[in-house]
Structure formats: structure tokens, C-alpha cells
């Protein structure tokens, strides 16, 4: 199972629900952040997921809580598409910044 932080948050899944499943089922985690408020408009949901994910620490998702319920050796991938930021600073700078934020948040 892949756990995507954005979809986990939007689905209102509880951390306790992760504990009810065998840890060996989990292989991969998508790290990102999102606003606390969950949009009700489908177009906004799609836009935010594809073009406006936030760096770790900028939003409301409990990444540390989610990770605490998953295997320690789970593969973690940073999935933070953000069209405005990439237009402003470029893809490489955005990727580097995403990695910096993730490292700082997870320390």
C-alpha cells in the first residue's frame, strides 16, 4: 500500500486505522503538505493535488504521526507539484527546496 499524505488527510483517515493493518502491507509514503481545510469543490481538489501541494511544515498534515505508524524502513518520496513555485524559481530549485524542507521537518 502507498500512503499519500494528501489523500490520507483528505480522506479523514485516523492514525489508529493505520495501526489496524499489518505493517508489511506498507511499502511507500508520499510526503507533502496541504492546507487544513479540505476543499469540497472537485476542481479545487484536483488543482491543489496536482499544482499546489505544500512543503513539509507549511500545512496541516501530521506527517510525523503518519510515519510513526508505518514501518521505519518505508520508502519516502517527496511529491510536491506546485505550478506557481516552479514557474518562479524553476524545477531544480523547487526540488532542492522540497528536499530541504522535508529533511528539516523530519529531523
What is the predicted function of each stretch?
Residues 2-3, 8-107:
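Histidine-acidic metal/acid-base catalytic patches
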Amino acid at each position: 500500500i502507498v500512503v499519500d499524505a494528501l489523500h490520507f488527510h483528505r480522506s479523514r483517515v485516523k492514525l489508529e486505522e493505520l495501526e489496524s493493518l499489518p505493517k508489511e502491507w506498507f511499502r511507500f509514503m508520499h510526503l507533502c503538505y496541504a492546507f487544513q481545510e479540505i476543499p469540497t469543490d472537485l476542481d479545487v481538489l484536483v488543482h491543489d493535488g496536482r499544482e499546489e501541494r505544500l512543503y513539509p511544515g507549511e500545512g496541516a498534515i501530521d506527517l510525523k504521526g503518519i510515519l510513526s505508524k508505518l514501518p521505519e524502513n518505508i520508502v519516502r518520496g517527496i511529491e510536491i507539484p506546485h505550478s506557481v513555485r516552479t514557474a518562479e524559481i524553476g524545477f531544480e530549485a523547487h526540488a532542492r527546496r522540497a528536499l530541504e524542507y522535508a529533511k528539516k521537518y523530519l529531523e
